[in-house]
Amino acid sequence: AIIFDLGLSSFQLLDYTRGFSFKSKSKIDMNMGLASISAEYVLNNYSENNLKLILKLLGEESEAHKIVKNIIKARDVKKISTVSQLVEIIEKSKKKDYKKKINVCTKTFQALRIFVNKETSELINGITAATKFVKSGGKIIVISFHSIEDKIVKYYFTNYSKNKSNPSRYQPEEKKNEFIFFENYNKKIIKPSTDEIINNPPSRSAKLRFAIRNKNEFK
């Protein structure tokens, strides 16, 4: 089996120099080590439309328009370089909902981190490689922590599964099975128990999915 734990490392979060934490006073970098750009560069150089797309698609931020408008205004006056600057912009743009536990900055920070580190493409590349190397009967297990990751995993497992694929009825039988790499996929999500969440609060958003490899060769 191959297991993917897509959670952000606590060591990275606690390293305030990387700019992942809202509490950081450092530069807003968000680079995990391999990225060619920083969040600082994105915030100060990307167009208004591109910034809105990043926040909407990768952060699922419903108030992306307001936040980006204020980012543009702020950077026209002074370069956005620190986490505290971005936090201030977001807090001015969004009303705090005391009924929700999530910080108002969470979705924007998530979107920038995913974009800077190309996390979605890295996930796709990873599970594709795993499909190639896992033998028949082996499992590919993925623990995701937000809906974007989960949607990618669900789509991948479903699309290449025996019971979910819908090939054309006009294709020959061997072609119908050519791109089926998993046995009947059970789309049930495994979530952490109440005890796990109490002992490990960051696990509250975790979702585990797995698929069982069949004997078809991955070419």
Predicted regions mapped to residue ranges:
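S-adenosyl-L-methionine-dependent methyltransferase catalytic core, i.e., the SAM/SAH-binding region
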Residues: 1-219
